[in-house]
């Protein structure tokens, strides 16, 4: 099982195919298996890299509070480990925010940026300022099995197979690790840094994603060289709900910037 060490954590990763590199970063509570349909689609023409963010899947999490700055540092450590000067990076939700912060903090390393259902802030509006702290508390009180089932049911409307994957991904997380990671994730803020993104950017949003859609127009307006596309028949698990449309959008974008 390929791993690397980064900032006190052992990180799992997987490389498939040869060619220009694309790195996919998964959403919170999920893992690298989220991208199976993308790996299968792109592996014949690109070097496809997936990994488990610290505290998720097969990656470890050091004791103590989690510093969200380590997320983007880990992604760069992965690139260094694989001797990649630049890459196209893609992420969904938390993984998108990690990718966004990587493009802001390490602009010379990012050739293109793909953000799927991605927030730039956890205090974007009054609702989030009230709801996110409540969500942090509730995540400490609700058992992981129940949290997993709630999320799986909500995100299985367009693809029933999502239910099994999401509950399995949740089962790999301990309650302690999840709460420490979630505390860090929900404090990530990039709203004031969007203008610092220097690479071409594609924003993808599911037409039924009511979790992050309110931020997408703002991000498109403030990321200089960006375009936005809506993915039909998709909720927040956009690449799981409509992988064909997501794959085509990513393929077209990469071809355009190559």
Label for each model-derived stretch:
Residues 1-10:
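N-terminal cap/lid segment of alpha/beta-hydrolase-fold proteins
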Residues 9-61:
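Conserved HGGG/HGGXW glycine-rich cap/lid loop of the alpha/beta-hydrolase fold
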Residues 40, 49-90, 248:
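Active-site loop/oxyanion-hole signature of alpha/beta-hydrolase fold enzymes
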Residues 91, 95, 99:
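Gly/Ala-rich beta-loop-alpha elbow adjacent to hydrolase catalytic centers
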Residues 100-105, 111-141:
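Flexible "cap/lid" loop of the alpha/beta hydrolase fold
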Residues 124-126, 141-195:
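Conserved alpha/beta-hydrolase catalytic His-Asp/Glu region
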Residues 201-234:
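Conserved loop-alpha-helix segment in the C-terminal half of the alpha/beta-hydrolase fold
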Residues 234-243, 247:
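Catalytic histidine-centered segment of alpha/beta-hydrolase-like enzymes
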